[in-house]
């Protein structure tokens, strides 16, 4: 199906949709490095521009609108009073584009914590906004580890099906399990995910295989505690330390931080996926991304639709 992608970043979600056979007509992001990465790996159909300045007429008609909108600007007060918060404004842009393009379906991805803001009231308002556009809306939390991503990353996936479309979206069934229950494969460990990568300190031609020299100080906080190499990594995030920077997970050997390439592998990006920008920018792009393997899992379920 024809897809329009908003808040595309480096293209993790888009890569999953592309692998599932969908045709991404148009994408958008404001981050120049992320857009350069997207163009290098996915296509030139991405527009580097503030979505607030884009007229929907410039966006092609499509079957699906996809995107992971920022959630930091949300509060009940903001939702009720329409207080202008820069990041809340981006959510309104998603609503604006869906309303203008009227796609058959939409998919919105966000952090699990969005469901708990103001005891769930903000999330209820968001779902109500989507339903007000004329869509049957459902939401479910998926753990990326359950689909083969070497990371316990939980995300809420919101699916909208236009009211006149005779289709029920089914969320993908897990392929992996922590305890290998029901014949499922065992969660992919971080050590397995990194096993094919050479030591970044040795000569190699692996792209983006440099790492931060920021000293490891294990204190129990995310990014500052040893990893269990036999388990998936904790959530890779671009926001999480007390300075608002990128949390760079330590390598399982406990001697250094993960390289950009290693962190990308934990996010399930293929090894030939090349990132643009300086090291900090690349770490941020990786942390903000939807794991492509999870993107593929949710994207392929749209293939069950057999309409026009």
PLM regions with names:
Residues 24-25:
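Short beta-strand element of Class I
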Residues 38-39:
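Conserved SAM-binding loop
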Residues 31:
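Conserved SAM/SAH-binding beta-strand->alpha-helix loop
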Residues 199-308:
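C-terminal target-recognition/interaction regions appended to catalytic cores
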Residues 1:
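Nucleotide donor/acceptor-binding cores
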Residues 54-64, 72-229:
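Class I S-adenosyl-L-methionine
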Residues 43-50:
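Conserved SAM-binding strand-loop segment of SAM-dependent methyltransferases
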Residues 4-17, 51, 61-78, 105-110, ...:
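Conserved proline-anchored active-site loop of SAM-dependent methyltransferases
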